[in-house]
């Protein structure tokens, strides 16, 4: 019985990690990385600009602490680059028409503008309190 539990736990661990793995081409070879590993390795973004990445990370960090280091921007960027039918982003389930990138980019631009109007600086330069006040 303990052997069965061990196999089950190993299978569960494998499925959990492989579901979040993303494929990157590095030096002509495909690498499977988690969003956190992709962020740590500073993998280039395919869709989002540097400003969009910094805005997304700070907003997400205000909502879900730890999301920046977990690689939220790498995950979103990777999903935006996927075929719409393969994307795991909520826009797909809310009836948005593909491509999804403009929807996310317009939202990030609006968030950036709101921070500039209210605090006279980009969202990525706001204090934690200021950032949370815009999210609340």
Say what each PLM segment does.
Residues 18-26:
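Sec-dependent signal peptide hydrophobic core
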Residues 42-45, 53-56, 60-136:
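Flexible, low-complexity segments enriched for small/polar residues
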Residues 3, 7-13, 26-62:
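C-terminal segment of N-terminal export signals and the immediately downstream linker at the start
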